[in-house]
Regions:
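NAD(P)-cofactor binding segment of oxidoreductase domains
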Residues: 75-103
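N-terminal Rossmann NAD(P)H-binding glycine-rich loop of SDR-like oxidoreductase domains
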Residues: 7-25
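Mid/C-terminal beta-alpha module of Rossmann-like enzyme folds, strongest
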Residues: 199, 206-253
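Catalytic helix-loop patch of NAD(P)-dependent Rossmann-fold dehydrogenases
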Residues: 82, 87-90, 110-153, 158
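Conserved C-terminal active-site "lid" loop/helix of NAD(P)H-dependent oxidoreductases
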Residues: 215, 225-231, 248-287, 298
Length: 298
């Protein structure tokens, strides 16, 4: 799959945050993209995926599908595992058989939180503290076990104009509530889905060389808490009437312990693919601008 070859690419979970952005940024691609979600292709059914891959001569799968409800996964781990692990194992096995490549999206939740408050690199020991992280890690491990060609990208705090996410929730709350409490003791980096999608599309356009396969980390540049993120959202959106107050995580009881520090080290990604990663506040401005345009045209 060199730069000159035309390849057939299957995007699963194409109606989600990342999939929607890949649909947008791949419009000018010379490659052939096939976009599916659960209504078009049930990735938990091996035979269905195998038939789709064979009939459309798929060279690359970009798997954006996932069970992402972190809290619900604690009482629904079986279904979380089906989507985050078993379905991934299916795709990895199929791509191993046909020699194609699987680009898979994983998460910072495979880590329990770095107690040294230093960015996590790809070699950092994993230690998921909940069902969501466990099932996502199992998905990663199934890819490695399959020996298929792969690029696994762990990301964090994904948000966008599409779907439900922290940014859109904060926009709603800060425009309707006199005050809100947001946790300050969970630190990481937001990732604008548009940036990650552009990075993935650029990797595909440059050519899926065997030397670039492996495990990578990607988020926007910078570090913040959820409280910092909320404050920046309100400031950029000019929602100045809402009093945003910092609070401890234990003030929001949750069935799963979230990582206290999960900043991802992106050095390997940037060096391998020679890509610049935008700072998180700049990307937030892009997202808010696009959200404004979407609201104007709806």
């Amino acid at each position: 799959m060199s730069e000159s070859n035309i390849v057939n690419i299957l995007v699963t979970g194409s109606n989600g945050q990342l999939g929607s952005h890949i649909r947008r940024c791949s419009k000018q691609s010379r490659h052939n993209y096939f976009y599916t979600d659960v209504d078009e292709l049930d990735i938990t059914r091996y035979a269905d995926v195998q038939q789709f891959v064979h009939s459309h001569q798929i060279d690359c799968i970009i798997n954006c599908a996932a069970y992402v409800n972190v809290d619900q996964a604690e009482t629904d781990e079986e279904n979380a595992d089906i989507l985050n692990h078993a379905a991934v194992e299916n795709m990895a096995s199929i791509m191993a058989d046909n020699g194609g490549i699987l680009i898979h999206i994983s998460t910072d939740y495979v880590f329990g939180g770095n107690k040294n408050n230093t960015p996590c690199n790809e070699d950092e020991p994993t230690n998921p503290t909940g069902a969501y992280g466990r099932t996502k890690l199992a998905g990663e491990q199934s890819i490695l076990a399959s020996k298929c060609r792969h690029i696994i990208i762990r990301t964090s705090w994904l948000y966008s104009e599409f779907g439900k996410n922290f940014c859109k929730t904060m926009l709603n709350l800060t425009s309707t509530k006199p005050s809100i409490n947001v946790v300050f003791d969970q630190v990481g980096t937001p990732t604008y889905a548009g940036d990650l999608a552009e990075a993935i599309c650029t990797i595909v356009e440059k050519g899926l060389d065997k030397g670039n396969e492996g495990l990578y980390h990607y988020s926007n540049e910078g570090v913040c808490s959820w409280y910092d993120f909320a404050k920046e959202i309100a400031q950029q959106a000019h929602h100045n009437s809402c009093d945003i107050r910092p609070c401890h995580s234990n003030e929001f009881p949750s069935p799963v312990k979230r990582p206290s520090y999960s900043v991802l080290d992106k050095t390997k990604f940037k060096q391998t693919f020679n890509l610049t990663v935008p700072y998180w506040t700049d990307s937030l401005a892009v997202c808010l601008s696009r959200l404004g345009n979407l609201e104007t045209h709806n």
